[in-house]
């Protein structure tokens, strides 16, 4: 199962971002497929937070548009809500300790632990995720072209 990062969904939603076309096409392929895909509520809340932020965008998205984008994904029959389970904290702690995660990398470790716990492939443009042992991850375009990291 795949699990997209915040950046992938923000890029798919916002037409004014250079990676929009790649991410929109990738997301359309995911939605049109019958394969299960995961969504983290923490990722979706960050999508709403970022896309509606006047500091991030000269013309931020309306709150109802951002929620509509997220809800369109959540209502797909093959969408799986992915939340931390019993093993998440121990995986998260291990990743933080092993990689000396600090600051914003702690959040990255939290998401990496979520993907590892669920056995998901993390889809992101952030190559810093390569630092987390045991995490399977891909860049959207690379995944579409069959390349692996």
Task: Go through each PLM region and give its residues.
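Acidic, PIN/NYN-like endoribonuclease modules and their adjacent C-terminal/linker elements
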Residues: 112-149
């Amino acid at each position: 199962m795949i699990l997209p990062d915040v950046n992938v969904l923000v890029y798919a939603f916002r037409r004014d971002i250079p990676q929009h076309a790649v991410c929109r096409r990738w997301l359309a392929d995911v939605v049109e497929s019958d394969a299960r895909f995961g969504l983290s509520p923490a990722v979706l809340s960050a999508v709403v937070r970022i896309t509606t932020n006047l500091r991030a965008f000269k013309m931020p998205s309306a709150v109802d548009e951002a929620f509509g984008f997220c809800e369109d994904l959540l209502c797909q029959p093959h969408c799986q809500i992915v939340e931390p389970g019993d093993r998440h904290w121990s995986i998260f702690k291990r990743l933080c300790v092993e990689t000396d995660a600090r600051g914003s990398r702690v959040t990255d470790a939290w998401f990496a632990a979520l993907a590892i716990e669920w056995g998901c492939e993390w889809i992101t443009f952030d190559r810093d995720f390569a630092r987390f042992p045991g995490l399977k991850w891909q860049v959207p375009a690379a995944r579409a072209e069959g390349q692996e990291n």
